[in-house]
Amino acid sequence: MRLLLLFLSSFLLADSEIFIDQSGANATIKLEQLGSSNLIGGADAVAGSMTSFNLTGTDMTLTINQIGSSNIFRSDAFYSDYVTGLFVFNGDSNQMDILMNSSGAYSADYANYNIEVTGGSNAFDIAVAENSNADYLDLDWIIDGDNNEFDFEIDYENATNYIDLLGDSNEITFSGSGYAGTTSSDAGYFYLDLTGSSNTVDITQASTLARDWLKIESNTSNSTICIVQNDGGTTTSC
């Protein structure tokens, strides 16, 4: 069974809005918005008032393209295994806010998310399976721009997290937790390729068995990088 509620709102000289509520397997969803101050959110929203959209099911392919400035993409209920997601943001002052299986009531395994950002002063807040492992997650970021803020939290094992960042005065805060396996092949792996100046990076890896892996390649000046790896006990923070 598949249920898709999709409402589109587009008026001359007004912002475009997409409200969506999806349940069921094998869904392919592609959404593209061109221009400024556009919204993608939940089916319970009304014009001018945003709620978060719901996606539930397995084997889902989701593509989001927001091309322009001051756009918003928001989801507080993203429950699905075997998801392939491509999120493309090209512009300034955009917002992306996603919770993926935040409560742990479902699962979020075998997901492959690709996030591409071109522009400045964007804000991204992503939490994946805070109370339940997102096993075999593959999360890739490609970022080109200045003054962006990225805050993301993942509870995972058998997973990889890659960031390619080119730009200045960006802020990245990452918190990784979970079981993280017993060998390098099933650990949580984080790789950062950083180029630019005056960037601030805070990384915390706190898996149960301390099998976290971290690699950083940096060509930067006047930047601050803080790394904490901890499987328990008392630690100082960044």
Regions found by a protein language model. Name each.
Residues D15-C238:
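Low-complexity repeat regions of mature extracellularly deployed or surface/particle-associated proteins
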Residues R2-L12:
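Sec-dependent N-terminal signal peptides
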